Amino acid sequence: MTLSSIPTPTATPPDILRCAYMDIVVTDLAKSREFYVDILGLVVTEESDTAIYLRSFEEFIHHNLVLRQGPIAAVAAMAFRVRSPEDVDLAEAYYQELGCRTERRTEGFVKGVGDSVRVEDPLGFPYEFFYATTHVERLAWRYDLQGPGALVRLDHFNQVTPDVGRGRGYLEDLGFRVTEDIKDEDGVTYAAWMRRKDTVHDTALTGGTGPRMHHIAFATHEKHNIIYICDKLGALRKSDLIERGPGRHGVSNAFYLYLRDPDGHRVEIYTQDYYTGDPDNPVVTWNVHDNQRRDWWGNPVVPSWYTDASLVLDLDGNPQPVIARTESSEMAVTVGADGFSYTRKDDELAGFKLGSTL
């Protein structure tokens, strides 16, 4: 299936500050609370029998994550904060010119957030744009509450889409800037990292069957905080929640850990990427066959990390249909009979890394 190109609107795009929160549907609120609050230590801003509003320790807006009880695990919204109330108007007009479905609620879609617009964007993702929000206590100095694995900030989203190049152009029109990408010698793009704040990304595009949500990522201060989370999961006999890592990414240079929540939603714990705020910040391009692009130490990527992702919902709360990627898949070209990776590009031996062997 050939996807149509996305036109560049004449309307001014909203001035997006950062990724702000994700609204996800879970099938067992109690189990999700145990994972996000009891194990990961996110702060409960407020909760009811049907929803829990969570934030990280340095956050001052109402929440970074909403857990809502529902029949199917999925993502209801990926929300971005904009610079002013007028930027909500700009977002609505921008997507209306694109021909996207929009819904505006002056009272907000969730507690703690005011005037907002949600859209079904050209890639099929449920985006939200808002400015007005309830301020809450920033707990950065409350070391009596923070554990050694404290999650201090929401860092980024990651989205799965069939055509990364198409999505990249759309997000660049929206004002995002590319910091890193993965390509092959033929120019096929497998992934791209896009930012608004001065880090490596606020969201990333991963090539695959989509629209689906690959992961939400929270930052810790240092890598030892991630090691503690691993130790805690081991002590609780919940090491099966660890999908991948800990390790260091090549892309972003960040230390990472990937977990799966009780519904399979993927959560990354992430720390120590780099500053990208200068206007001439260079794009870093990785070869898809570079064995150190996804893990700087060359450790293999588990297949589920490539294949599994969360469904996303339309504005009526129904799962969006997904479209398969037709370009080469990153897993296929790097692993297995038809794939190869290298540790040193000029080596004669090329294969794929399994354990300690190439």
Model-derived regions, located:
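Short N-terminal helix-initiation segments at or just after the protein's N-terminus
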Residues: 14-27, 62-66, 92-93, 99-107, ...
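Core segments of cupin and vicinal oxygen chelate
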Residues: 14-17, 23-61, 109-110, 159-200, ...
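N-terminal entry module detector
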Residues: 47-116
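Conserved short beta-strand elements that form part of the metal-binding/catalytic scaffold
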Residues: 42-76, 119, 125-134, 180-214, ...
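Vicinal oxygen chelate
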Residues: 2-12, 18-27, 70-162, 189-194, 238-358, ...
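Conserved active-site tyrosine of GNAT-family acetyltransferases
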Residues: 32-37, 95, 124, 167-171, ...
